[in-house]
């Protein structure tokens, strides 16, 4: 049995000597490299926090003391130390989650993987302990330097610092990166702190007796008249000046919090001492740990892009992917096309939130470095800054993962849309994303965005329509436009049979038409974006059972095109297939538009339930939620055979007549 296998919980660490702890750290690294290489996952971040996490669990007593991990992708070591070593199932259906999970362990508190929230959690937890008399309980928040670029973290620091008696320890895991190198003024400030030297000073400054001595000296001097007050001001100013030169804690202590560090995050003894000092102080303390992402694994350290932030299945010896060469992805299409657009249009600028490479903006940045801005993990700022850029005559393209749009929704609504700003938002990883779990699925955007006045939303089905719709989006100068697409390979081309004048594509007409004018079919299938693949398969399955159908791709799903409504009037049933939540989704909106225009055709909305969907593969999740061609075809066939709904009367004489455009007109 290895030493790691003998660890069933954090208490098992308490009796280990220094040599055993070093051995355990090595075993954990070997375990992570072996197991995460086999399943895929966040390898680099976890290799960088082995000693840090060991020290946290040695000094504090989880779950009595609450340990919160910001973002949570660096919690693998924490899982290993809290009795979860079945990593063969990591990020697989029914197996270990890739992020903290309350269902797995009482040691896990925060499940969301959205960055910069841990300090607000720590503020709330510690306030709760104080108000309920649990003064012996500590709250520890582990947050990366990348997450500290998010404004929410500083809102929490502002509140935590105002109460000097709450037992909050903030461990800054400073590896200089989020996905990629951390950017901005705060990142530069941390680099300045890294250059400082303070050995032994932290032990004094976090001693309550030091604070008490300073308080007594201040009281005696300020109470002794003008001369004493002048002496105090002089001594205090001298102390501050010397401190800022020798040990520049800077912004942290200016906010009223004790600062400990910088500490070598891979030195177990140093980390334990720093955390012990912080714990014993009894008030809010920042512990600044310097770590290396991918520490101890050469392939990760040599990866310039993101130091193995997240890996597929790889060969642990080389770090190279073991599967077939990656197919062209949606991100690749965006990467190439936005770079081409930027070459043609000097007014187009790119904005990203700490995701330059994952979003595909690096190619544009290499060609036009002054026109790509990485704002850090700051979606709110990104969108309002984009509105300002639009006001000054630029056309910003903001690249976000779909799940992170939620963080900047107010800014999209009130700063971009209200001001009719020509801003394009590109949403990668829309829909079901798979193994990263509920906080990474991009399934909320379709419902959220349809309530934004004047917004145009495109959902491309293949590479050609992606290129078209991105170019159409950046041609709009007086309204927000959004282009959404899923994670993964872009797939084969899906050519249209016909394009209506308002931009809606007819992808298929299967089966014999009927009705009084010979133009009606049984089922109209509307595919939203990448779900057009499923829509076409449903149509083929229905045709095999003698049920006729038409397949439409609206291309621009917001606003709803009139030709979609008129085509619906010539069918007995409409089926809308989308990879967002059904509640308030595109199907719901099409139904509203149909009823508003007097079209009473029955409509079935096929999408995701309003639930937090657990981690599994994309196909498994779609199977469980009923969003598969087989299930949709079965349900639709039953509806057709069981219905007595007559063909709806056509709303107009010609479903393909020129109508007002659903896609945005360049302006």
UniProtKB/Swiss-Prot annotation:
Swiss-Prot/TrEMBL keywords: Isoprene biosynthesis, Magnesium, Metal-binding, Thiamine biosynthesis, Thiamine pyrophosphate, Transferase
Cell membrane in keyword set: no
GO molecular function terms noted in the UniProt entry: 1-deoxy-D-xylulose-5-phosphate synthase activity; magnesium ion binding; thiamine pyrophosphate binding
Residues reported in the UniProt entry to bind Mg(2+): 145, 175
Name of the protein this chain belongs to: 1-deoxy-D-xylulose-5-phosphate synthase
This protein's pathway: Metabolic intermediate biosynthesis; 1-deoxy-D-xylulose 5-phosphate biosynthesis; 1-deoxy-D-xylulose 5-phosphate from D-glyceraldehyde 3-phosphate and pyruvate: step 1/1
Binding site for thiamine diphosphate: 73, 113-115, 146-147, 175, 297, 379
Catalytic activity annotation: D-glyceraldehyde 3-phosphate + pyruvate + H(+) = 1-deoxy-D-xylulose 5-phosphate + CO2
Gene3D superfamilies: 3.40.50.920, 3.40.50.970
Quaternary assembly: Homodimer.
Organism per entry: Kocuria rhizophila (strain ATCC 9341 / DSM 348 / NBRC 103217 / DC2201)
Matching PANTHER family: 1-D-DEOXYXYLULOSE 5-PHOSPHATE SYNTHASE-RELATED (PTHR43322), 1-DEOXY-D-XYLULOSE-5-PHOSPHATE SYNTHASE, CHLOROPLASTIC (PTHR43322:SF5)
Origin: domain of life: Bacteria
Enzyme class, spelled out: transferase
Cofactor(s) listed in the protein's UniProt record: Mg(2+); thiamine diphosphate
GO cellular component, one term: cytosol
Family recorded in the similarity comment: Belongs to the transketolase family. DXPS subfamily.
BP terms from Gene Ontology: 1-deoxy-D-xylulose 5-phosphate biosynthetic process; isopentenyl diphosphate biosynthetic process, methylerythritol 4-phosphate pathway; terpenoid biosynthetic process; thiamine biosynthetic process
């Amino acid at each position: 049995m290895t030493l790691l296998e003998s660890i069933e919980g954090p208490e098992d660490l308490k009796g280990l000597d220094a040599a055993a702890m070093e051995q355990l750290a090595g075993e954990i690294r070997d375990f992570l490299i072996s197991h995460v290489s086999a399943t895929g996952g966040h390898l680099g971040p976890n290799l960088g926090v082995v000693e840090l996490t060991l020290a946290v669990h040695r000094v504090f007593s989880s779950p009595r003391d609450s340990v919160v991990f910001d973002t949570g992708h660096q919690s693998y070591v924490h899982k290993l130390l809290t009795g979860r070593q079945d990593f063969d199932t990591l990020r697989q259906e029914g197996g270990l989650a890739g992020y903290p999970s309350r269902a797995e362990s009482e040691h896990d508190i925060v499940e969301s993987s959205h960055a910069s929230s841990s300090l607000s959690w720590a503020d709330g937890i510690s306030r709760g302990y104080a108000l309920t008399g649990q003064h012996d309980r500590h709250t520890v928040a582990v947050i990366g330097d990348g997450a500290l670029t998010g404004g929410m973290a500083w809102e929490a620091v502002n509140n935590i610092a105002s109460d000097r008696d709450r037992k909050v320890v903030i461990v800054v895991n400073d590896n200089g990166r989020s996905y990629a190198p951390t950017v901005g003024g705060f990142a530069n400030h941390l680099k300045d702190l890294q250059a400082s030297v303070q050995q032994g000073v932290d032990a004094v400054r976090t001693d309550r007796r030091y604070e008490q001595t300073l308080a007594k000296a201040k009281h005696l001097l300020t109470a002794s008249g003008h001369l004493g007050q002048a002496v105090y001001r002089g001594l205090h100013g001298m102390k501050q000046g010397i401190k800022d030169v020798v040990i520049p804690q800077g912004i942290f202590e200016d906010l009223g919090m004790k600062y400990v560090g910088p500490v070598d995050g891979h030195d177990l003894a140093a980390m334990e001492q720093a955390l012990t000092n912080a714990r014993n102080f009894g008030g809010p303390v920042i512990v600044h740990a310097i770590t290396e992402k991918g520490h101890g694994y050469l392939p990760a350290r040599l990866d310039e892009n993101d130091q193995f932030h997240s890996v597929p299945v790889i060969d642990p010896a080389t770090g190279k992917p073991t599967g077939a060469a990656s197919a062209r992805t949606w991100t690749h299409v965006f990467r190439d096309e936005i770079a081409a657009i930027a070459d043609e249009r000097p007014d187009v600028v790119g904005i990203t939130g700490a995701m330059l490479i994952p979003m595909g903006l690096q190619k544009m940045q290499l060609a036009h470095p002054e026109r790509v801005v990485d704002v850090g993990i700051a979606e709110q700022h990104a969108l309002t800054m984009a509105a300002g850029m639009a006001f000054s005559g630029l056309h910003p393209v903001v690249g976000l993962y779909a799940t992170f749009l939620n963080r900047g929704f107010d800014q999209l609504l009130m700063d971009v849309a209200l001001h009719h700003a020509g801003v394009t938002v590109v949403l990668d990883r829309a829909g079901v994303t798979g193994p990263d779990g509920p906080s990474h699925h991009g399934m909320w955007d379709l419902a959220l965005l349809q309530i934004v006045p004047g917004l145009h939303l495109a959902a491309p089905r293949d590479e050609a329509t992606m290129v078209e719709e991105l170019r159409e989006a950046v041609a709009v100068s007086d309204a927000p436009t959004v282009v959404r697409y899923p994670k993964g390979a872009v797939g084969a081309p899906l050519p249209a049979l016909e394009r209506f004048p308002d931009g809606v594509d007819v992808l298929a007409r299967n089966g014999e038409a009927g009705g009084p004018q010979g133009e009606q079919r049984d089922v109209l299938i509307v595919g939203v974006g990448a779900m057009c693949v499923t829509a076409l398969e449903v149509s083929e399955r229905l045709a095999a059972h003698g049920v006729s159908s038409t397949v439409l791709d609206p291309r621009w799903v917001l606003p709803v095109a009139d030709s979609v409504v008129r085509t619906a009037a010539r069918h007995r049933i409409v089926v809308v297939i989308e990879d967002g939540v059904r509640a308030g989704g595109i199907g719901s909106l099409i139904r509203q538009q149909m009823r508003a225009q007097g079209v009473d055709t029955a409509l079935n909305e096929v999408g995701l339930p309003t639930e937090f969907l657990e981690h599994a593969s994309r196909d498994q999740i779609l199977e469980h939620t009923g969003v598969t061609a087989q299930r949709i075809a079965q349900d639709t066939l039953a509806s057709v055979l069981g219905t007595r709904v007559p063909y709806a009367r056509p709303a107009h004489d010609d479903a393909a007549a020129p109508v007002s455009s659903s896609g945005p007109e360049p302006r």
